[in-house]
Amino acid sequence: MTYTFIISDESVNADGFVIQTKGIRTERFKKDPVMLYMHAREKGVIGRWDNIRTEGSQLIADAVFDENNPLGKEVKERVDGGFLRSASIGLSVLNYERIDGVDTVTDCELTEVSIVDIPSNRNAVKLFDKRGLIVLSLKESADGDKDLRTQLIEVLKLPATATD
């Protein structure tokens, strides 16, 4: 069975900004297309992403779960059951601009894609009969890297204490 997800698009997410699909650099990610659960590196890799591609303004990928990993198997079962249907990207912002009154990431590097319970982009979902879209979290990554979080807070002009 193929598990195809829209992992990004150009809709305004819950954090109030847009990520331009053409500005997402995927070359490095394609060499190590890790799938995490809830952006938690400490839980390990639960799978990989294959067939990463752009269709119009959507970035799409196929999920391959590591069923030898207990969490990977559990997450796959939740996706099969329809209990988890969303994805979220982790990225490093390289450039952003205000376009048509909306903060817009115009250049970034994709670092990981996670299966998540609640995405900030309502369209970052598993594809069934309908097509959906992305997610980006302000949570600090498990490895303590705060660069993305800090950059996003600055871009969105949020207080330093902002959280998801």
Model-derived features with residue positions:
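Polar/acidic, low-complexity leader/linker segments enriched in S/T/G and N/D
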Residues: 1-32, 136
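Residue microenvironments linked to proteolytic maturation
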Residues: 2-4, 32-33, 50-145
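Short, charged/polar surface micro-motifs in flexible loops or helix N-caps
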Residues: 11-12, 41-43, 66-69
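Flexible loop/turn segments at secondary-structure boundaries
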Residues: 13-14, 43-45, 96-97
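Short, solvent-exposed loop/turn motifs
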Residues: 18, 42-45, 103-104
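A diffuse structural propensity rather than consistent per-protein peaks
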Residues: 20, 85, 161-163
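SsDNA-processing nucleotidyl-transfer enzymes
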Residues: 27-54
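N-terminal leader/targeting segments
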Residues: 134-163
